[in-house]
């Protein structure tokens, strides 16, 4: 009997030692350990919860922890008025030298609207949306209106992950802020009639011990977004991604009509591959650039940003030797364009020369998610003859080439005179010089079998 008693004690001790350690951030009675920043919204303790009330004529208000946290697992529950917007800051800061102390940093979005982006990650007062829920639409049904919702946030090194009611929502790889405070946001209101509405938080607890031991396995995560420019995260490397541009040199690229990289018309500055401003002509400045090798089946991802009135493009299945005359090298094109200011947007047929379209062949929808003042992500998927265009995580075009319908489509386009256009088994990838300033970064490719 004594032997079994000792064994039981040992097992209990082992279980106790291995149990996850949680620390409450809110004692259910008062706001000890917290302080208010920026706005004048009111926070109260009611029924063992922190309740924030909206107030007119005041900016976003934050109830922040007096301590900072780096690697942690945070869990809590929230309940929010259906007409409000709110959030949970983490790894956030307030510095006098930054916008006069404005709270900034990562925010777990609380969004009860029909947009349904709860669980997404917003960079408050800094970069804006890092992980809108268009990147993971399966999680948009996780939020429960009028009920308590359970949040989980995991931060370990550069890995940041979120859950809502047990459903994985966001997953980013980022190194902007390694530590900071946690805060509960009461969003500013724009209509005085919305004053007095509330959002509540309860059961707020954090684990900061042996975090790596308790984070969720990779198989149970949302799709990852790498926010560190021109790098590959461990997950991307594991999945077979490669940098098509290294962010520093012209390695792997050349001019479409020359053996080397153009000596003018292009610049590499601060991790950005830039087409310099020219006369607006097609390949009349530095000329297009192409990959030195060809690609067959792949997923290509490119971040791009345009200046006002700009025109450019990303081409694939390119044969640089096909066009011996003036103009750009020939290939299928993911159009990059300022639809509002560039005249090419009104040419072609039914908008097939507008941004994200398969240039002069298939139009992207008018309601595509594009912001010409921000960075946008173009994704091109090629699997044999099946091709897709994606813009900012939303599929905007898909088509099949090498068939009668495709050939008929080409016959009514500007490519009609190029034999077998778009039907090549493989080709180069091209970034276009159209004489307008356009920026590229995060040029990545995953080759498919």
Q: Model-derived features: where do they sit?
A:
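Bacterial Sec-dependent N-terminal signal peptides
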Residues: 1-21
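Carbohydrate-interacting regions of secretory-pathway proteins
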Residues: 20-449
